[in-house]
């Protein structure tokens, strides 16, 4: 018990800097002066809540010299979506709600502005009951027996 005097204070734990303090310009400069590794990265699309990002290979797009654009949904597919939606008596908003997408997504697909996404196309196909992919575009989907 000789090492514990009444006058000395032993600090057992010391809190580190909070997240806000660690991000400050002052903290970054201090860490650089100490020679520590500092990693800075910018958040990408943080507040935009993007559900379906473009998954096409951008490096492949960069290597192409002739056409520097992604393929869009054809107008034929857009017209089929529009006809199928109207035959079911749905508005763009109703169809979007039914497939858990935003109304703007449906508008983009119908106008031919959207980059095709198989997941979204599959949901629209099931909702309107018409094929949108492959060679039989516009034909009704045959419903087979359910697998058990």
Curated annotation (Swiss-Prot):
Residues where N-acetylalanine is found: 2
Compositional bias ranges of the Polar residues kind: 48-58
Modified residues (Phosphoserine): 4
Highest taxon in the source lineage: Eukaryota
Subcellular location per the Swiss-Prot or TrEMBL entry: Cytoplasm; Nucleus
Modified residues (N6-methyllysine): 25
PTM comment text: Phosphorylated.
Induction pattern: Up-regulated upon cardiomyocytes hypertrophy.
UniProt GO molecular function: calmodulin binding; DNA binding; TFIID-class transcription factor complex binding; transcription coactivator activity
Tissue-by-tissue expression: Expressed in cardiomyocytes, cortical and hippocampal neurons.
DNA-binding region: 92-111
Gene3D superfamilies per record: lambda repressor-like DNA-binding domains
Keywords assigned by UniProt, alphabetized: Acetylation, Calmodulin-binding, Cytoplasm, Developmental protein, Differentiation, DNA-binding, Methylation, Nucleus, Phosphoprotein, Transcription, Transcription regulation
Region (Interaction with TBP and NR5A1): 69-108
PROSITE patterns in the record: HTH_CROC1 (PS50943)
Domain HTH cro/C1-type: 81-135
PANTHER family in alphabetical order: ENDOTHELIAL DIFFERENTIATION-RELATED FACTOR 1, ENDOTHELIAL DIFFERENTIATION-RELATED FACTOR 1 MULTIPROTEIN BRIDGING FACTOR 1
Protein name (database record): Endothelial differentiation-related factor 1
Gene assigned in the entry: Edf1
